[in-house]
Amino acid sequence: DLHKNKGQVTVVIDLSFSASLDEVKEFILNEQSPFILSQSDENLLKFEWFIDEDTKTATLLEVFANAEGFEVLAGKVMGTPVNLKFRDLFAVEKMTILGEPTESLKETISVMNPTIKKYTGGINQ
């Protein structure tokens, strides 16, 4: 569809890390991803990691069917042991939200100083 906002919210988190690559991959593959899967519902469409091994940087891409799905999952995982370990392993360099999060979620994540960009137009299949 042309210029039809389906309400999806995409979260792009650029990160850096100083831990070993093995420790980071172990966390992503065997702790965080399984935990997120266990806490998510049909509103989480993507939760994918991309790593540049040379620069020790990573990007976490999360795509939600709607803003409420983002808020529900964030509420379930924030403050958990897995989330605290994530915060120990990674430094958030930049967080960008594409779409419109709920007002209460904006307050919750304001400490991460996200850049929020509203939908303008394009093609949605």
Language model regions located:
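Short S/T/G/P-rich N-terminal loop/turn motif that feeds into the first structured element of a domain
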Residues: 1-58, 65-76, 88-125
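A short, acidic, amphipathic alpha-helical segment used as a generic capping/interface helix at domain edges
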Residues: 78-85
